[in-house]
Amino acid sequence: MGPASPAARGLSRRPGQPPLPLLLPLLLLLLRAQPAIGSLAGGSPGAAEAPGSAQVAGLCGRLTLHRDLRTGRWEPDPQRSRRCLRDPQRVLEYCRQMYPELQIARVEQATQAIPMERWCGGSRSGSCAHPHHQVVPFRCLPGEFVSEALLVPEGCRFLHQERMDQCESSTRRHQEAQEACSSQGLILHGSGMLLPCGSDRFRGVEYVCCPPPGTPDPSGTAVGDPSTRSWPPGSRVEGAEDEEEEESFPQPVDDYFVEPPQAEEEEETVPPPSSHTLAVVGKVTPTPRPTDGVDIYFGMPGEISEHEGFLRAKMDLEERRMRQINEVMREWAMADNQSKNLPKADRQALNEHFQSILQTLEEQVSGERQRLVETHATRVIALINDQRRAALEGFLAALQADPPQAERVLLALRRYLRAEQKEQRHTLRHYQHVAAVDPEKAQQMRFQVHTHLQVIEERVNQSLGLLDQNPHLAQELRPQIQELLHSEHLGPSELEAPAPGGSSEDKGGLQPPDSKDDTPMTLPKGSTEQDAASPEKEKMNPLEQYERKVNASVPRGFPFHSSEIQRDELAPAGTGVSREAVSGLLIMGAGGGSLIVLSMLLLRRKKPYGAISHGVVEVDPMLTLEEQQLRELQRHGYENPTYRFLEERP
């Protein structure tokens, strides 16, 4: 038998060495335990998780796992404990136990579940009943809370929600962000928590919503925003205008805007009679989104169409407001976390400071928004007046042609009536907006708005009266004009409907109490509404009537003045005024004065103590001295409730 190997000789010669049969079972146990431990550490770092981030995960009845900061692999609990990691406070305690060197201050549940392979729960057998699991780990975060920085890709929207009265988990806040994006037809790209209020509890969430893949969004604006609509050159936008008319009037002040004049629908190929008409009809062309729509709108008017520029400026103003509020909220959250150890009075002062900053910011944005609306309204009024003047010039040119062509006259009349209709629509929308915001102010301007609409109707009737100078043309176009007037009519009778947000007193509209329903405008037969209002007026000869109507139709007549509505809104500026027009205005003024006097008399009669006479009053000698003094005091306007029983005494 050969000599033994050196290793065998060493084992047999060393004193106190355990025999070989005892070492073999120990080695087998170690070899069996190694695959079991390796199965628990088999989970690899997810694609969305950093390899060195501190995290814990656990399922009820299985070994609790934690991430190794050096390798990024999941390791089992050293004490082989099985915990149900559901309570955030228990998760925080376990994180501090696993990572004592990191000074864990808070925990946050991940937004995505990760696969955990061969999670056998410490089974020593070679097989697992359920080897694969999906688990949502908890992140162990050291230090104070800092909101996560989110990337906003091109074409996406950055939004946030704060609810100071609700303290929800991060999972619930993440679901709210998903629901908010889904309600707008978008998908959630990323989210971050705001304003912590406990362990894994937050009062707000910020998130990024992006359009679904394959959705074209070249301008990078919000999906569904009206400013993203682009019209090819030469296209008709009358349909979009009609759709906007069908929508209900917006209630909030921020959403109020005045519809601008758009390109008219022209079915005929007859060229416009004036080159000025071509300059008025705006052409909406797609333009790239400006860097700052507010500055572009105020600084460089006319770069793009008025309606598109206003919508973009309003959207950019809201985006700027959201960015500023988000920055203030972040600073507030950081200051609140840093001031936890300060006295209560100091923390209260800090909160009041940030509240004042937010209030100042809101006031600045509100003033900018009001300035934006007023500028837009002023520009729209100017556009409406220019378009109306151009349409009236075209109508007069078509009538004065030799010989006048019925087709051109009808086309020019349609343009003119639509221009007047836009002014009526603008007046109605302005009144409805004021009624929704300030009912008292709307009550004060009711008479002015009603008078304005009446002036527009009179102006239209006088323009239609010019057709009587050509009886053959008037007879030929009478059916078409009647149909056109019926479709385009929008006068004071439209104010019968209650304005949005108005009180029950406004349900009567702007119609005076003694007025009847306005009938649709009809083609005049040699007379106007002023002639009908004063039947005692003698009828003028055709030449004088024609001169009067031409002077009234061209931008010269009806110098209606109002404190709420500028003169340019009611009638074109001019110099020539006929005597008949002045007489009509005087009659209207006298009627208005009579209504005011009657209203004052009715109000005075409604007083509880009757009218106070300031003339000579005959003293009844049968009255006592006290009653005579009471009469004298009441005559000078003094009303003392103490003496009321004397009046009621028989």
Curated annotation (Swiss-Prot):
Keywords: Apoptosis, Cell adhesion, Cell membrane, Copper, Cytoplasm, Disulfide bond, Endocytosis, Glycoprotein, Heparin-binding, Membrane, Metal-binding, Neurodegeneration, Signal, Transmembrane, Transmembrane helix, Zinc. Residues 39-580 are extracellular. Proteolytically cleaved by caspases during neuronal apoptosis. Cleaved, in vitro, at Asp-620 by caspase-3. Zn(2+) 1 binds at E206, C209, C210. Its main location: membrane. Residues 504-519, 534-546 have a biased composition (Basic and acidic residues). Residues 442-459 are annotated as: Collagen-binding. Residues 293-484 form the E2 domain. Changing H433A: Reduced affinity for heparin. Reduces homodimerization. Cu(2+) 2 binds at H561. It comes from the Eukaryota. The record marks D620, P621 as: Cleavage. GO terms for biological process: animal organ morphogenesis; apoptotic process; axonogenesis; cell adhesion; cellular response to norepinephrine stimulus; central nervous system development; cytosolic mRNA polyadenylation; endocytosis. It is a single-pass type I membrane protein. Disulfide bonds join C60-C84, C95-C140, C120-C128, C156-C210, C167-C197, C181-C209. This is Amyloid beta precursor like protein 1. The gene is APLP1.
